[in-house]
Amino acid sequence: MQPDERTRVGFLLEPDTWVGGRNYFRNLLIAFAQLPDPEIEPFVFTSKEDDTALAGIPAVKVVRTSMMDRRTLPWLARKITAKALAGDWMLQRLLNQKGIAVLSHRGPLVPNSSIPSVGWIPDFQHVHLPAFFGERDRRERDRDFMDLCRKCDKVIVSSECARLDLQAFAPQYAGKAEVLHFVASPAEQGILPLLPELRQRYGFEGPYFLLPNQFWAHKNHRIVVKALQLLKQRHQRVLVLATGETKDRRHPEFFDSLMRYATECDVLDLFRVLGVIPFNDLSGLMVHAVALINPSKFEGWSTSVEESKSLGKRILLSDIPVHREQAPALGVYFSPDDAEGLARGLCESLKDFDTESDFRIQESTRVNLRSKQVQFAETFQQIVLSTGRQ
């Protein structure tokens, strides 16, 4: 299909988009580039500031606008206009000028928009774990999710679990739900730092496990700390490197309380926090790890689980419904409240680990990755095309 015949689909990448959201869009756009003859053409609207989230992604048109640069005159004019006219009319005009036929992963910008929209609800965590949210946050999420369901032509969810949640949350809009299982696209191994370089940069030695979750309360880091304490008491040394954002907006005290707990458990030498690190370093740590860990109490569709599947890495993961749905072939499940079970999984994984066989599995997994990326992209493409035809 010729480029001028393709349906143009717009994405809005605001500067304050959360890290998980940016990674989600990156994985989707990289997968889309694998389609041999696409019928849609992605346009990403973002700020004029440098944005590494879009670096190296082919087949994507990027439209940079000062309307997305915070505290600039165009941004301020956009905000004032949106408030006065009850709609983001300045950005809507830009989308119309670029011929956008479908707006993806957000609600319509203006009332009765001429551009159909496909909303996105990452998860219904606040329904399942209300204690992790304040009353105001729960009300806002209820309101925002219901607005998406009502105003959007379709609503993307990442799992069958989330589709059932939407059906229970807004049964009158259940028919709008579209399940899109995303696939992680790891960096090319040739550009990743080698293990000796990573060891020197981050100051660790020996085999290690990687916990690449944000430091948010529901991510359940405490169970990992407890498992390390149990192992240390038995004179078994297991090193866990933890990466991710250390600020939890809803629980600002969480990280400090976690580190106090790690101190009390005497495992600061085994639970090493690296924080937010460059993407290629994170990918390199995944490649060389004994295994990944995801102990989370709740997920919409876990990025780290998908990364383990795309890389061909073992992962120790909490036994929750969405992790069962993701079904990693090399997954080792444990109850999210069972430190003993996690400790056992860590020991067994360390004992089983062999560098040569691990890299052979990774190599064979990469051979099959493209077909999964294509399936991911084709599913999204059909959602967009069917929305545009309505």
Briefly describe each language-model feature range:
Residues M1-Q390:
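Carbohydrate transferase catalytic cores enriched for Leloir-type hexosyltransferases
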